[in-house]
Regions:
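Transmembrane-helix bundle of Major Facilitator Superfamily
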Residues: 2-196, 328-330, 338-340, 344-352, ...
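12-transmembrane solute porter fold
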Residues: 21-46, 57, 226, 239-244, ...
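Residue-level signal for the membrane-embedded core of alpha-helical transmembrane segments
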Residues: 73, 127, 219-222, 293
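Membrane-water interface at transmembrane helix exits
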Residues: 83, 137, 199, 225-233, ...
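Hydrophobic alpha-helical transmembrane segments of integral membrane proteins
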Residues: 126-127, 161-162, 182-183, 193, ...
């Protein structure tokens, strides 16, 4: 009997552990799905929000970018705080803030209040994202299991970003725009309960906080983003545009200076000792610049160029949405066979092809041809899990929260600037006309640059 028990107990314990890991991953993924979905779900609701609450088109851009600017600029602090207080605690703090802010968004009575609570949503998302990566790395110690978990995490990101317009369109058409925020409340509560029961806490690691660096990072990103949005509303030579742009550049320079001189910088230079990590951080910036900007331009362009409402816009982007989800899942099987860098390069190359096709077919081609042109953009989701795996594998092992914060801050900063820059170019044609050609030509070029970086780094790693 003892031999029999010895034979079966490890198996039972293993099954229980696997079950607990699966539930922890479900909780992590549910929260992560909410924060990625909220980056794009609002795009198709902007017309309804404007009709209900009023506000200029440039203000509507801040409903999107208020979230992503706060998200991006606080990720570095949140990554450090995740190391200080433990990833599970950090995740639950972020989830609580995000759910409360979502409820506030649903009852907003003015655009100004909505932008303010969207910023609060971004604060919660900033806490949640690096903690989620650190929790996955801590929960799944075995490399193959971790790779599978990161593939799920990456797939959730791709599905959330791409399905935002469709989910938003359905909710706006059936219930109203406020429903896109209310849906986060029950999902967030369920995720918090699961995580508290099935995820172990990471070991807290105390270190001083770089508040001057954090404030400069927030100031720089907000003013640079505001400068691009102002350019679309008032022109490139307007006083407010120039003031915001110059402030952003000076703030960025001051941030670099502070980080080089402060004893405990917000971004520890040791994080960038590995060239692969530095490269994947740069590629992550370009990736989100292109993806967030593309989804924003497609959602706005389909409405203003083709006259589609929120629901029709969501369904129009369904081919891209389906391909995005499928590719994000498929990448988990492809990476073990080909390696991370080739998969990243393949996804980015497809993005360049798709952006070029949209630029050629966006304004005047048949709608069906335009929508088929978006499918290769969905294939870029191949790169998501591979990029994440590279970032977490090449970052410092004892600073996982900070490494995750740096990687995701770069991605979210790219997303915020992508919406601002490409959104401005979208509406800056003659007579303030809308054209998909200009923003998607820039997107294709940016994807091409990222392909070159990935290819060069891949070759260096094999020589």
């Amino acid at each position: 009997m003892e031999l029999l028990a010895a034979h079966f107990v490890p198996s039972t314990r293993s099954r229980r552990r696997s079950h607990g890991q699966a539930l922890a991953l479900a909780a992590i993924s549910a929260g992560f799905l909410m924060i990625t979905l909220d980056a794009t779900i609002v795009n198709v609701a902007l017309r309804g929000i404007g009709a209900d609450l009023g506000g200029a088109p440039s203000t509507a851009q801040w409903v999107v970018d208020g979230y992503t600017v706060a998200f991006a600029s606080l990720l570095l602090l949140a990554g450090s705080m995740s190391d200080r207080i433990g990833a599970r605690t950090g995740y639950l703090v972020g989830l609580t803030v995000f759910v409360l802010a979502s409820a506030a968004c649903a009852v907003a009575g003015s655009v100004a209040f909505l932008v303010a609570v969207r910023v609060a949503q971004g604060v919660g998302a900033a806490w949640l994202m690096p903690s989620s990566l650190a929790l996955i790395t801590h929960t799944f110690a075995e490399p193959q299991a971790r790779r599978r978990a990161l593939a799920v995490w990456g797939a959730v990101s791709g599905i959330g970003l791409a399905s935002g317009p469709l989910v938003g369109g359905i909710l706006v058409a059936s219930v109203g725009w406020r429903a896109i925020f209310l849906v986060n409340v029950p999902v967030g509560l369920a995720a918090a309960r699961l995580l508290a029961r099935h995820a172990d806490e990471t070991t807290p690691r105390r270190r001083p906080l770089d508040l001057p660096g954090q404030l400069l990072a927030m100031f720089s990103l907000a003013t640079l983003t505001g400068g691009f949005i102002s350019a679309g509303a008032h022109g490139w030579t307007a006083g407010v545009t120039l003031a915001l742009g110059i402030s952003g550049v000076l703030g960025s320079a001051a941030f670099v200076l502070v980080e080089r001189t402060v004893r405990r910088p917000l971004i520890d230079p040791d994080v960038f000792r590995d060239k692969a990590f530095t490269t994947v951080v740069a590629i992550g910036f370009v990736f989100n610049f292109c993806l967030y900007g593309s989804i924003f331009c497609l959602a706005v362009g389909l409405g203003r160029l083709r006259g589609l409402d929120a629901l029709d816009t969501g369904f129009a982007l369904l081919p891209m949405t389906v391909v995005t989800g499928a590719m994000a899942l498929f990448a988990g099987r492809l990476v073990p066979r080909l390696g991370e860098w080739p998969v990243v390069a393949a996804g980015l190359t497809s993005g360049a092809v798709g952006a070029t096709l949209v630029a050629l077919n966006g304004s005047h081609a048949h709608l069906a041809l335009l929508l088929l042109s978006t499918v290769p953009i969905g294939v870029t989701a191949l790169a998501m899990p591979a990029m994440t795996g590279l970032a977490m594998a090449s970052g410092p092992r004892l600073r996982l929260g900070l490494a995750a914060g740096v990687f995701n801050a770069s991605r979210q900063a790219g997303g915020a600037l992508g919406v601002a820059v490409l959104g401005t170019i979208l509406t800056s044609g003659p007579g303030a006309s809308v054209s998909l050609r200009r923003p998607f030509l820039l997107t294709a070029g940016a994807y091409g640059l990222a392909v070159a970086l990935a290819t060069l780094t891949s070759h260096e790693g094999t020589t």
